[in-house]
């Protein structure tokens, strides 16, 4: 039996919540029983491999798709019934930006977009355009992938929405552009206090922003927790073990990932550090150190975990 990982954040106030959400395409379920909880003011990173259901989840939150079961709430509203109101308070960066207006200049696109958002802040939009080094006179259809991504981010941020929903926001950005863009996003979050939901499969790129982690695999949300809980409870233990060592029976269900060479083991284990160390020692292992995993390593460990 495997360790039960936390999936209920029990936050007093949630910007995003789903309960038992299911979505089916034909006979195949893209989502099954998803209970997503994003606290107000959090920067929540939802990770998973391609095809895990991340983009489908975001489209449900925006009312672009309807669930086949369960309940969705975004800032207390039902996107199916109040879709326009929800979208007016969300800044959305899609995974694939299909402009539909490729002939428009970036400046004209901003004017077009601003019409739909009463809270649009032109002064802030200009500041972002300058910070992102955007030439607003260029047609958006002729922009590089990285610059097009920055235009999407500007469109999402310029009306200072209470919720940003970003699907692979760093896709197409070179290392320098990525660092600058994430810096601008961090400043935006600090200034506005908005909630951010980021979907990605490249965790290290958004590591410095994240304070919550959700793990999605095969259409299910298998774990979600604050980052401090993750760092406290999931650690990598290095230990020397005697010849013929049979393992630590008391830890059978809590080992998230196993590794090591020869008589040295390197295990990612979920549990209280003192208790895990005690059980390893009682089994004959000599624990050399225990350290928290990076966010990316934790995500990989949780994604590779298999229920038994």
Named regions from a protein language model:
Residues 2-7, 264, 268-308:
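C-terminal coupling/interaction segments
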Residues 13-18, 23-217, 221-223:
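ABC transporter nucleotide-binding domains
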Residues 40, 106, 227, 292-295:
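Structural motif detector for alpha-helix initiation sites
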Residues 77-80, 242, 270, 293:
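Short, surface-exposed acidic/glycine-rich loop or hinge patches that mediate macromolecular interfaces
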Residues 138, 254-257, 286-289:
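A short linear hydrophobic-aromatic micro-motif
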Residues 164-168, 244-246, 274-277:
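Short, surface-exposed beta-strand/loop "edge" segments at domain boundaries and coil↔beta transitions
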Residues 179-273:
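ABC transporter nucleotide-binding domain
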């Amino acid at each position: 039996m495997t360790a039960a990982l936390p999936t209920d954040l029990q936050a007093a106030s949630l910007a995003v919540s789903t309960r038992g959400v299911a979505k089916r395409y034909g006979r195949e379920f893209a989502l099954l029983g998803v209970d997503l909880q994003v606290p107000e003011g959090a920067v929540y990173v939802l990770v998973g491999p391609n095809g895990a259901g991340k983009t489908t989840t975001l489209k449900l939150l925006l009312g672009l798709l309807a669930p086949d079961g369960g309940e969705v709430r975004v800032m207390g509203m039902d996107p199916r019934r109040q879709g326009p109101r929800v979208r007016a308070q969300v800044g959305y960066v899609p995974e694939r930006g299909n402009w539909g207006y490729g002939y428009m200049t970036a400046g004209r696109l901003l004017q077009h977009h601003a019409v739909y958002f009463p809270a649009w802040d032109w002064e802030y939009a200009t500041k972002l355009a300058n910070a992102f080094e955007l030439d607003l006179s260029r047609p958006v259809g002729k922009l590089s992938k990285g610059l097009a991504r920055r235009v999407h981010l500007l469109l999402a941020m310029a009306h200072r929405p209470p919720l940003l929903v970003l699907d692979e926001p760093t896709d197409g950005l070179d290392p320098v552009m990525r660092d600058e863009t994430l810096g601008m996003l961090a400043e935006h979050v600090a200034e506005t206090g908005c909630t951010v939901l980021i979907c990605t499969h490249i965790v290290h790129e958004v590591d410095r922003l994240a304070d919550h982690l959700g793990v999605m695999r095969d259409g299910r949300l298998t774990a979600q927790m604050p980052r401090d809980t993750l760092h406290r409870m999931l650690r990598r233990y290095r230990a020397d073990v005697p010849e013929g060592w049979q393992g630590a029976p008391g830890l059978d269900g809590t080992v998230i990932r196993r590794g090591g060479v020869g008589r040295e083991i390197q295990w990612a284990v979920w549990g209280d550090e003192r208790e895990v160390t005690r059980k390893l020692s009682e089994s004959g292992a000599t624990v050399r150190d225990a350290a928290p995993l990076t966010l990316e390593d934790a995500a990989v460990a949780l994604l590779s975990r298999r229920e038994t």
